[in-house]
Amino acid sequence: MENSRRDMMAGACAATAMTFAPAALAAWEPSQRYPDPAVQSLDPSFNKYRLALAGVERLATGCRFNEGAVYFGDARCLLWSDIPNNRIMRWDEETGRISIFRQPSNHANGITRDRQGRLITCEHSGRRLTRTEYDGAITVLIDRFEGKRLNGTNDVVVTRSAGS
């Protein structure tokens, strides 16, 4: 039997995965030293913002591409987007428990809070910017500009309006 290029590539990928998988799946342990030597600044000008006694903690596994984290101090939880898995995740600060806040999320990306504390979400597949009301209802804030659908809403920041 003759091996095809596809067979060779599949074998190479499998060998690579077997080589690096143990390191990727190894138990993660937080640093016992401060400042955490695993946290490195690529730009020295950032060092003035680094907290010497702050470390890195793993909150969750099973996510594929996380983005848009926003902290809700009043609810003591952290929300973030897991874009490829089409969900918004929630970490409860009091229990340490991870749960799904919303799925599907329309491939939510950037998220933040408005000045009233509601969740504002950029939705890739919805091609829109939405607000989650206190009762859980979703309000579309914008999905078109000059009559055309938005394309790839990404990150969002809420600022004060003029005069407020």
PLM feature spans:
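Sequence-structural signature of mature extracellular/luminal beta-sheet repeat domains
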Residues: 2-3, 9-13, 25-164
